[in-house]
From Swiss-Prot:
List of residues binding sn-glycerol 3-phosphate: 67, 91, 146, 273, 307, 346, 397
Localisation: Periplasm
Pfam families attached to this UniProt entry: SBP_bac_8 (PF13416)
Keywords for this protein: Periplasm, Signal, Transport
Name the record gives this protein: sn-glycerol-3-phosphate-binding periplasmic protein UgpB
UniProt KW Repeat keyword: no
Region forming the signal peptide: 1-25
Family: Belongs to the bacterial solute-binding protein 1 family.
Record gene name: ugpB
Organism in which the protein naturally occurs: Brucella abortus (strain 2308)
Amino acid sequence: MFTRLITTSVLTGAIALTIGSQAFAQTELAWWHGMTGANNEMVNELSKEFNESQSEYKIVPVYKGNYPETLNAGIAAFRSKQPPAILQVFDAGSGVMMAAEGAIVPAAEVLEKGGYKFDKSQYLPGIVAYYSKPDGTMLSFPYNSSSPILYYNKDAFKKAGLDENKPPKTWPEVFEAAKKIKASGASPCGFTSTWLTWIQTENFAAWNNVPYGTNENGLAGTDVKLEINSPLYVEHFQAIADLAKDGTFRYGGRTSEAKQLFTSGECAMLTESSGGLGDVVKSGINYGIGQLPYYEGHGPQNTIPGGASLWVFAGLSDDQYKGIAEFFNFLSQTKIQVKLHEKSGYLPVTLAAYEETKKSDFYEKNPGRETPILQMMGKEPTENSKGVRLVNLPQVRDILNEEFEAMLGGKQDAKTALDNAVKRGNAAIAAAQ
């Protein structure tokens, strides 16, 4: 919860509300988002709870498609001068929004308009830093931050003769387990992954402490040259390409589609966002959680935040900004953060919520649920593991996905795919400067 600033205007308003009898119409605040399944249910639940907690403002959640589609819808709406009050933007879109000076109002400023003061010391450091300017100004509100983890099917492990209580820790162990699962018939597919860009390149770089690009992956300057064709990347993606030849690895799609390959029982292991937990639980599968795999001699270092944050456009009314500030304050309440964390798998963005969850013995009762937090907070970030910030990261991800798909389709090997991705990605980054 934010610190309330008591000002003359606030006190005057409070007195007016106390003595006045006029009925005020609710101010509706559209919240455009890209959440599906269990996470969409959580968006609706939190919106309803906020709406019932007061009578001045009404949050209206609107699903606008997947993450990239939601970002594009928000940009188009702003250009047509009809922006939503709140836009959920995925991690890759942060650079796009940060570059749009004048188009957005920093979350810290929105809070001040509502009479609140943002205190970054109340938040998990890695998360608040990711969505802030170098001077510490918070630009967006970290609603659903996540960390990639390994989910595995305990029943499939048991059938394949693997220890159901010991998930593989390194990538070679994952690949060997996947082969054994496929060969034994325990599952038709051994391993799959959502988000090959976010998990297998951006977080791969951070977790294994290797550069994604120059200039600290874009955090130290916008003139970035990609470095994702170095030997460790080539080794990793060639191993995945080899597993794809006989279906030991199965590709589900560019975003979160592969999650269904796991929840259906088709694939026995899945690397996916911690925020995918809700759908995994709903599937009823006998699952376990392991940390994100790494390569010996390189990792583990620290993961970088995924998920999304809430951005606010310029040009809204003062009343809208006050309502948004109230909603952000509501989302920051410890009980709300604990609920969001425990039900969805997303990280508790406040330290108070994290401490409250630990005190309740939740992590002891739910093994693996603290893993994504420990991955992010375990070590001080290096220049390779602070994050990735490109003004056109969604476009660069599309380029990488095209090359990965050609590789997985048997049209090129990993080195060719990564060399092509670097060449095309660098050209796109240069053109966006």
